[in-house]
From Swiss-Prot:
SMART domains in alphabetical order: HMG
Keyword Cell membrane appears in the UniProt entry: no
Transit peptide boundaries: 1-26
Loss of function: phenotype: Has a temperature-sensitive growth defect in glucose-rich medium, with slower growth and smaller colonies at 37 degrees Celsius but not 30 degrees Celsius; the phenotype is suppressed by overexpression of YHM2.
Known role: Specific binding to the autonomously replicating sequence 1 (ARS1). Interaction with regulatory regions: probably involved in compacting the mitochondrial genome. It might play a positive role in gene expression and replication.
Major subcellular location class: mitochondrion
GO aspect biological process, one term: mitochondrion inheritance
Protein name: ARS-binding factor 2, mitochondrial
GO molecular function: DNA binding; DNA binding, bending
Localization per record: Mitochondrion; Nucleus
UniProt keyword list: DNA-binding, Mitochondrion, Nucleus, Repeat, Transit peptide
Length: 183
């Protein structure tokens, strides 16, 4: 039995708003999980130049030193990498640069196909708008203290201004849900 059925069975009919909240939370969680799963399937960052070298020469190092543990073989490989001639090392570095540029291109294409993140909530939108102003007024404060100041400003903000941010968020989230429905 899934968590949604447990939630719906455990409350009475008078708790309809709670059902909607539970449903919304589960959908948001599912949407985030789906996005994270898609991201995991994306292109992987290429390995370093040293690991390219290690892949090419590991079997040779194992043949030369069959009794050594893998950590000791890696240590030998690291020492040989450090003492490697510049032109040979450059071959691996340029190969890594080539792989990295291919990765960046594939990553950009992949990221364009991902659904965007959910719109920021009302407080986050407000915080983003006033952050630079608050930081300029209090340059000696830590990030945590500055965020507390922004939180206090939000709490003391006139409700009509808060409602403006809330309405903008509701509109943005409706557009987001319409454009990227959760099946």
């Amino acid at each position: 039995m899934n968590s949604y059925s447990l939630l719906t069975r455990s409350f009475h009919e008078s708790s309809k708003p709670l059902f909607n909240l539970a449903s919304t939370l589960l959908k948001a969680s599912k949407r985030t999980q789906l996005r994270n799963e898609l991201i995991k399937q994306g292109p992987k960052r290429p390995t370093s130049a040293y690991f390219l070298y290690l892949q090419d020469h590991r079997s040779q190092f194992v043949k030369e030193n069959p009794t050594l543990r893998p950590a000791e073989i890696s240590k030998i490989a690291g020492e040989k990498w450090q003492n490697l001639e510049a032109d040979i090392k450059e071959k691996y570095i340029s190969e890594r640069k080539k792989l990295y540029s291919e990765y960046q291109k594939a990553k950009k294409e992949f990221d364009e196909k991902l659904p965007p993140k959910k719109p920021a909530g009302p407080f986050i939108k407000y915080a983003n708008e006033v952050r630079s102003q608050v930081f300029a007024q209090h340059p000696d404060k830590s990030q945590l203290d500055l965020m507390k100041i922004i939180g206090d400003k939000w709490q003391s903000l006139d409700q009509s201004i808060k409602d403006k941010y809330i309405q903008e968020y509701k509109k943005a989230i409706q557009e987001y849900n319409a454009r990227y429905p959760l099946n």
